Amino acid sequence: MSEPIYKFFTGRFLPDWYQLSKKEQESILAKLHQALEKLGAKTTLLCNTYWSTDQWMWAGVEEFPNIEAVQKYMATLQELNWGRYVDGSSVLGTKLET
């Protein structure tokens, strides 16, 4: 049986993001949210970190039902050229039972 996968991430927008119109930015973000929903994934936490670090604007946690959903979501990020607009870091993990 597959178990949930958690993606811990940090990010910041790159200059190309600010070259997009507000409508284009909103369209990309909407497609990301739709992809999460379609895969049964969700953002469980999204934090503004801009005030505490000069490297990242946000950090958060996404929960995916399985590793296949993570892989499909990453494919969506590539299709949307997310790496052109965002610099980030992420790590995947599973829940540690204590």
List each model region and its residues:
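Conserved, mostly hydrophobic/aromatic
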Residues: 60
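Conserved short beta-strand edge segments in small beta-sheet-based binding/regulatory domains
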Residues: 82-94
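Short, surface-exposed basic-aromatic patches at helix termini and helix-loop junctions that form
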Residues: 75-82
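Short S/T/G/P-rich N-terminal loop/turn motif that feeds into the first structured element of a domain
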Residues: 1-57, 65-71, 75, 93-98
